[in-house]
């Protein structure tokens, strides 16, 4: 078996270490309405189309109960759209600062391309958001061969449509000749639903939720415990393999090509 393409997520996988761009914005739009949500809650739906992310937050039992306490009723679809419009406005203003490629990504991409492997990408950001992120990332040396956003297909993650569109545009089939790499549970589900080899990256991920400084300064035992929690979460949601950093990806690829991993 030969791997012919790798499909990467963006924030938390290839750019924006820790996936912090959307986090505080999600928290802020709820806080403005007197409903406090935690960073852990805000991260849980990460990877979804952002309006679906807002909707998923309103459906969490604790948040829904707090909203009902404040407003006397559960959030409506109008509330969701109002918050999403605010989310977009704030996010657009900060996105250029959160498009820096994560350490090691550019080198791994270059190595994959030397092997003739095509580079695709999917995201939970809209096309308009990605015009900002992709442009800034390209200026800093990261540009995949193709990008698909939820706007380009009938639905975003966990549906497989963005991966399928990448496969068509890159001219690669069958799907088990491709790897999906991401940093969220929804990435794992997207890859598995598409019939692809699916790999979760841990350091810099939304699931780990730490800055690079926090990772580097944390007690090694505590950090290892957190890494293993994320590793298990990825495995429970379909990851065929996990890597701590992108530099380990080619090693996983070699195991796949030697048929030392089994797709199921």
From Swiss-Prot:
Entry cofactors: Mg(2+)
Cellular component GO terms, alphabetical: cytosol
Keyword Cytoplasm included in the entry's annotation: no
Listed InterPro entries: HAD-like_hydrolase_sf, HAD-like_sf, HAD-SF_hydro_IA, HAD_sf, PGP-like_dom2, Phosphonoacetald_hydro
Pfam family, one: Hydrolase
Organism ancestry: Bacteria, Bacillati, Bacillota, Bacilli, Bacillales
Catalytic activity entry: phosphonoacetaldehyde + H2O = acetaldehyde + phosphate + H(+)
Keyword presence, Ribonucleoprotein: no
Cofactor: record remark: Binds 1 Mg(2+) ion per subunit.
Domain of life of the source: Bacteria
Active-site residues, record numbering mapped to chain: 9, 50
Quaternary structure, from the entry: Homodimer.
CDD domains: HAD_PHN
Gene: phnX
HAMAP family tied to this protein: PhnX (MF_01375)
Keywords carried by this UniProt record: Hydrolase, Magnesium, Metal-binding, Schiff base
EC number(s) per entry: 3.11.1.1
Function summary: Involved in phosphonate degradation.
Name of the protein: Phosphonoacetaldehyde hydrolase
Gene Ontology MF annotations: magnesium ion binding; phosphoglycolate phosphatase activity; phosphonoacetaldehyde hydrolase activity
Example of a GO biological process term: organic phosphonate catabolic process
Similarity comment: Belongs to the HAD-like hydrolase superfamily. PhnX family.
Chain sites annotated for binding Mg(2+): 9, 11, 183
């Amino acid at each position: 078996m030969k791997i012919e393409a790798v499909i990467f997520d963006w924030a938390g996988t290839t750019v924006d270490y820790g996936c912090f761009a959307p986090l505080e914005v999600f928290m802020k739009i709820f806080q403005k309405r007197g409903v406090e949500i935690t960073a852990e809650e805000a991260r849980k739906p990460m990877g979804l189309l952002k309006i679906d992310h807002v909707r998923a937050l309103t459906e969490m039992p604790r948040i829904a109960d707090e909203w009902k306490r404040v407003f006397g009723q559960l959030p409506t679809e109008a509330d969701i759209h109002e918050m999403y419009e605010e989310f977009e406005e704030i996010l657009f203003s900060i996105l250029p600062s959160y498009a820096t490629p994560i350490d090691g990504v550019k080198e791994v991409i270059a190595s994959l391309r030397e092997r003739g492997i095509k580079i695709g990408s999917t995201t939970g950001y809209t096309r308009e958001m990605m015009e900002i992120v992709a442009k800034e990332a390209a200026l800093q040396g990261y540009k995949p061969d193709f990008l698909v956003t939820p706007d380009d297909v009938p639905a975003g993650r966990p549906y497989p449509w963005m991966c399928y569109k990448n496969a068509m545009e890159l001219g690669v089939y069958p799907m088990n000749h491709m790897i999906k790499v991401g940093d969220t549970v929804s990435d794992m589900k997207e890859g598995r639903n598409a019939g692809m080899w699916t790999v979760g990256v841990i350091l810099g991920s939304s699931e780990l939720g730490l800055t690079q400084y926090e990772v580097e300064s944390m007690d090694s035992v505590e950090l290892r415990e957190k890494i293993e929690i994320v590793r298990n979460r990825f495995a429970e949601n379909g990851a065929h393999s996990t890597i701590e950093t992108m530099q380990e990806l080619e090693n996983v690829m070699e195991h796949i090509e030697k048929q030392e991993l089994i797709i199921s």
